[in-house]
Structures are given as structure tokens and as C-alpha cells.
Amino acid sequence: MAEANTMRRTATGKVISNKGDKTITVLVERRVQHPIYGKIIKRSTKLMAHDEENQCREGDLVTIEECRPLSKRKAWMLVNVVEQSKA
């Protein structure tokens, strides 16, 4: 079966944990408007992502891309490190 070229979702967020082997936890924040009051509020999601070379550290700003499920909670993979953390 031929593989289809589909657009995969991407997200940019901050690495909050790299304790797992080849796994990072990325906090992705987004701003949404409250449906009734109209105020802009922050919403966040923690995503598990695959880091094949263990190159990320806590505090890094990274771009991740959706992929096939790699484990129960991990269905994203690291694309690149946008900004290294200072520490």
C-alpha cells in the first residue's frame, strides 16, 4: 500500500522533563478566547515526544511533530530544538 503524503500536526513548546530514555515531556501553551466573557486565557497541554538522540534538556524550546503511536502516551517526535536553555 502506498504511503500518502499527509500534513502532520506540529507544535512548539518547552521541555519540562527529560527523565525518560529517549522521551521528553513538552508543555505546549495556547491562548484561547473564553466563549462567554471574551477574555483571552491560557490553556496548556503536556505531550510526550520521542527524542532519539537524547539531545534535549529541561527548558529547551522545541518543535515536535505528530507520528504513529510509539507507546501508550507517546505519539509525537522531536523535529528540532528551536532554542537551547540557558542553564
From Swiss-Prot:
GO biological process, one term: translation
Alphabetically ordered keywords of this record: Ribonucleoprotein, Ribosomal protein, RNA-binding, rRNA-binding
A GO molecular-function descriptor: rRNA binding
CDD domains hit by this protein: Ribosomal_uS17
Official protein name in the record: Small ribosomal subunit protein uS17
Gene3D superfamilies: Nucleic acid-binding proteins (2.40.50.140)
Family per record: Belongs to the universal ribosomal protein uS17 family.
Pfam families: Ribosomal_S17 (PF00366)
Subunit-level organization: Part of the 30S ribosomal subunit.
Family matches, as InterPro entries: NA-bd_OB-fold, Ribosomal_uS17, Ribosomal_uS17_bact/chlr, Ribosomal_uS17_CS
Protein purpose: One of the primary rRNA binding proteins, it binds specifically to the 5'-end of 16S ribosomal RNA.
Domain of life: Bacteria
GO CC aspect terms: cytosolic small ribosomal subunit
